[in-house]
Amino acid sequence: MKFVTTGLALILLAGTAQADFSANVGWASDYYFRGILQSPTSPSGGLDYESKGFYVGTWAADVYDGLEVDGYFGYGGEAGDFSYSIGYTGYFYTGDFDETYQEINLGGGYGILSVDVAIGQYDGDFDPIAAGNQQDYTYYALTLEKDGFYGKYAGFSQDASGSYFEAGYGFSVAELDLGLSVLFADEDLSITGDSNESLIFTIGKSFDLN
């Protein structure tokens, strides 16, 4: 679910007339999620089921130590020119790379503008001073998208902090989904304490399993 060029990266096909099973595979030159580097070069894959706006799925990617495995479900729909979604996502890890995240996801859109909010809890420690306590965070993102081009400003509040800007272009060639993006993240989102500027390339392919 956490593909680089979209930052989380679920695309809901709400309101379809039949149930759809699909799979996806991908690769990223650098795997960033919400402005934070997860791994330099990362393969990924996922499975999804969607029916009349309801969806459930799983997605996994290689990270520094082990695998990240996500599970998610929710509902997305449209009302006139507005789109909306609500769901749950859990982020789990097989190694020592990170601890579990769980969050409620809210989304809304109108035309080329979309707003996403995640309200979550983290089993690790954003701040060493708060070690041993579950951490709360809110993630917010504002995205403008048109004809494959997009720009996003996003950040964190509560126990987490930091913000980033991302811009890119996604397109399809020979049934492959390609993306090129640039990302500028502040020092709060860097493990080195320095700001990040990155050029990211992604490639992926989706499969209809019906």
Predicted regions and their residues:
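Outer-membrane beta-barrel proteins
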Residues: F3-G7, I11-N210
